[in-house]
Amino acid sequence: MTKHPTGIYVGCLVKVIRRRLRMELKESVINYSPFVLQHP
């Protein structure tokens, strides 16, 4: 099986997007936690 450069590129892109989404989720949780604590 030969790996295509596009496949490797897409894999790296998915990794980066996942990492970015995870960071955004963490930031949103940190930003919204005070509102959740104020309004249970």
Curated annotation (Swiss-Prot):
Superkingdom in the source lineage: Bacteria
Record-linked Pfam families: YneP
Induction of expression: Expressed at low levels in exponential and slightly higher levels in stationary phase (at protein level).
Name of this protein: Protein YneP
